[in-house]
């Protein structure tokens, strides 16, 4: 099995070192420069949904998406605290990721043989994240979930370190696990892997019987998971929505996998290779620990390896998507294993070679930091500080190659004299943000290639009831719209404005009855 390294729960004599200050400065500057980044695609969708929830909408009834509620809760909280705009969303993301970096720093302060390695962890994890993310990567489920997953692992690790307080730590691990499930149900096998390692420890290291070990594990875990999930279920019960929740979160995803075409395996390979390139410094450092871990592995490192292996499996089974940001699920274990790799390299029989690889990898990471700062700094220098709407939009156009096109697409609907009120977009939800309008119906129009045929009937019914003044259909999505949807569009709407990327339709009929 694995060894158990006895450590204090937290470093009770934590002192902010010069190294900490340097890492905080780098990560803080990167976070500050990321604040005005454009909201793109999913981010815009989540913010629109979060704002609707803040205004009283009920998720899955008044605003519908197939994702579990965790991500919408995060965006609703971010908007409530800091405002429903780019600064508010990315400010919350900076605090969240900063909390992850702080937790890595504090919990692993005495784990490595050289204490300064723990100082580097926030920089290696959060610094890399802020240096390589694209607009659609930031504040996604896979980037946010690293904090509760690591919390789950650390609490389970503490149950090993302090068996006399086992129930308390496993309860907290269950709380973290419940939060993880609110982000994505598909993370359940990943969580089960972490807890299975703990169960094996109880069976083979502590020589507990199967019944005792399972009971000691499941009771506090279950009670902990009820803490975040229970209130959400009670709320939906009060809204009479348990049937809708079951259909959306349990029945629908398998149907989508069965009935919709999967992406080619080449896309998975391509996004995986892209991730390896982006995380190259951590990959090199983590690989240095490989031989050592093969011979002798402790509980925490076992959990990190399980996170990588099962995390990659969780990503691979999501055959309808395979988006690049999915691989940020692997960021935290790669950073922790990179720290272990530094530790191993500096203890090797050839320390000079180890120092060369470590310094080279950290230098590459620093170059990525500087490149990201230079890119955003140059964009701000050309567009002006984003302290007013005009400069902000100019900056975003420079940072996202598609923002000029999106701005052009909403120009017509933003002209004076247009009918105010909600609109509906079959296309990029960033158009809601740029037009400063809300979504007219509950059902989203983002990524229509992932919609079942019957869902188009739901969209038609909701549009017929709401009759928003304008509907926009992006031209690239026309091929995914079933023929039976067009008679409704042509009967109720008329083409009003062509853009290079799509068509605005204006209401031609008023609701009957």
What positions do the PLM features span?
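Transmembrane-helix signature of polytopic, membrane-embedded enzymes
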Residues: 104-128, 146-147, 163-168, 303
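Short periplasmic/luminal acceptor-recognition loop of GT-C membrane glycosyltransferases, typified by
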Residues: 192, 196, 383, 393-449, ...
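Hydrophobic, aromatic-rich transmembrane alpha-helices
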Residues: 102, 274-311, 338
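Transmembrane-helix motifs of polytopic, lipid-linked glycan transferases
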Residues: 25, 91-112, 126-127, 151
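Specific aromatic-rich, kink-prone transmembrane helix
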Residues: 144-163, 169-172, 176-177, 198-199, ...
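Membrane-interface alpha helices of multi-pass inner-membrane proteins
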Residues: 28, 168-185, 191-196, 226-227, ...
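Membrane-interface transmembrane helices that cradle and orient dolichyl/undecaprenyl
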Residues: 152-172, 204-208, 282-301, 342
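Hydrophobic/aromatic-rich transmembrane helices and adjacent perimembrane loops
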Residues: 189, 313, 319-355
């Amino acid at each position: 099995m694995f060894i158990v390294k006895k450590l204090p729960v937290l470093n009770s004599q934590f002192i902010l070192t010069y190294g900490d200050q340097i890492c905080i400065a780098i990560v803080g500057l990167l976070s500050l420069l990321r604040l005005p980044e454009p909201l793109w695609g999913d981010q815009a969708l989540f913010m629109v949904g979060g704002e609707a929830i803040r205004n009283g909408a009920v998720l899955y009834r008044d605003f519908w998406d197939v994702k579990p509620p965790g991500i919408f809760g995060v965006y609703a909280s971010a908007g409530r605290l800091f405002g429903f705009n780019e600064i508010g969303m990315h400010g919350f993301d900076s605090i969240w990721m900063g909390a992850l970096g702080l937790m890595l720093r504090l919990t692993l302060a005495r784990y490595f043989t050289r204490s300064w390695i723990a100082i580097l962890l926030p920089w290696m994890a959060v610094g890399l994240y802020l240096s390589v993310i694209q607009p659609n990567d930031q504040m996604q489920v896979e980037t946010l979930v690293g904090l509760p997953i690591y919390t789950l692992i650390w609490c389970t690790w503490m149950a090993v370190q302090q068996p006399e307080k086992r129930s308390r730590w496993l309860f907290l691990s269950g709380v973290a696990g419940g939060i993880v499930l609110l982000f994505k149900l598909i993370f359940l096998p990943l969580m089960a892997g972490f807890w299975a390692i703990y169960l094996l420890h109880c069976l083979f290291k502590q020589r507990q019987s199967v019944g005792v070990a399972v009971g000691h594990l499941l009771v506090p875990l279950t009670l902990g998971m009820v803490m975040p999930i229970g209130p959400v279920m009670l709320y939906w019960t009060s809204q009479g929505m348990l049937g809708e929740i079951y259909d959306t979160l349990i029945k629908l995803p398998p149907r989508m996998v069965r009935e919709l075409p999967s992406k080619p395996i080449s896309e998975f390979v391509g996004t995986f290779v892209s991730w390896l390139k982006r995380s190259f410094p951590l990959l090199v450092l983590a690989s240095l620990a490989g031989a050592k871990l093969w011979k002798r592995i402790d509980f925490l490192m076992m959990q990190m390896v399980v996170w990588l292996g099962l995390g990659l499996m969780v990503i691979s089974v999501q055959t309808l998507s395979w988006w690049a940001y999915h691989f940020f699920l692997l960021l935290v274990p790669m950073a922790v294993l990179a720290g272990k790799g530094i530790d191993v390299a500096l203890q090797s029989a050839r320390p000079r070679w180890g120092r060369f690889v470590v310094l080279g990898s950290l230098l590459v990471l620093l170059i990525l930091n500087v490149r990201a700062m230079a890119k955003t700094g140059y964009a701000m220098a050309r567009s002006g500080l984003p302290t007013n709407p005009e400069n902000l939009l100019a900056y975003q156009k420079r940072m996202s190659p598609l923002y000029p096109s999106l701005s052009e697409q909403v120009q017509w609907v933003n002209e004076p004299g247009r009918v105010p009120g909600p609109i509906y977009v079959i296309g990029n939800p960033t158009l809601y943000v740029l037009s400063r309008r809300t979504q007219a119906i509950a059902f989203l129009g983002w990524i229509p290639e992932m919609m079942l045929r019957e869902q188009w009937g739901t969209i038609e019914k909701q549009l017929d009831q709401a009759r928003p003044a304008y509907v926009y259909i992006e031209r690239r999505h026309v091929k995914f719209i079933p023929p039976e949807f067009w008679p409704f569009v042509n009967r109720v709407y008329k083409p009003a404005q062509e853009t290079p990327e799509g068509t605005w339709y204006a209401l031609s009929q008023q609701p009957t009855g």
